[in-house]
Amino acid sequence: LILGGTKISERNFNQKVITKARKRIPIKVNKLCNRQPASSNNIADVLIELTQRNDLHGIYHWAGAEEINEYELAFEILNRAGISNPKSYLIDVSADKGNLNFRMDLNPLRNKLKTKALNIDKTLKELDFKEPLELN
């Protein structure tokens, strides 16, 4: 999954969630931090389509079609990985971090491309786990 607002030097959100779950380290997430996750496949499809279009120029932003907060996203990732009782791994730090919104306006591209932004369910379906996550 690709999330806006993540520092380049950091691992991506789903890798961080999975790594901490494997080591049974509590995962700090913010219920007040909204993001629009997109799959790398969806972004690649958009990039390919943009390279084939001579009529579109400029800087564009792309993200998933729906917003989700970090807590819910971490829960869904752990649930998809086959972790029982995912909530037991999550610690809400919204009181410390406050309200953050990484929402992106997709309107400049949305109606110009054949490729559509994926909703959260479709984005998470592209996040494959070949076998249940092993915990240490």
Residue ranges and their predicted role:
Residues 1-35, 42:
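NAD(P)-dependent short-chain dehydrogenase/reductase
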Residues 4, 28-34, 60-67, 112:
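Glycine-rich Rossmann NAD(P)(H)-binding loop
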Residues 11-15, 71, 75, 103:
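Short, surface-exposed alpha-helical segments at coil->helix boundaries
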Residues 18, 41-49, 125:
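Amphipathic alpha-helical segments that line or abut small-molecule/effector binding pockets
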Residues 40, 70, 116-120:
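Amphipathic alpha-helical segment in the mid-to-C-terminal domain
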Residues 46, 53-100, 135-136:
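Mid/C-terminal beta-alpha module of Rossmann-like enzyme folds, strongest
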Residues 84, 97-136:
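C-terminal amphipathic/interface module of NAD(P)-dependent oxidoreductases
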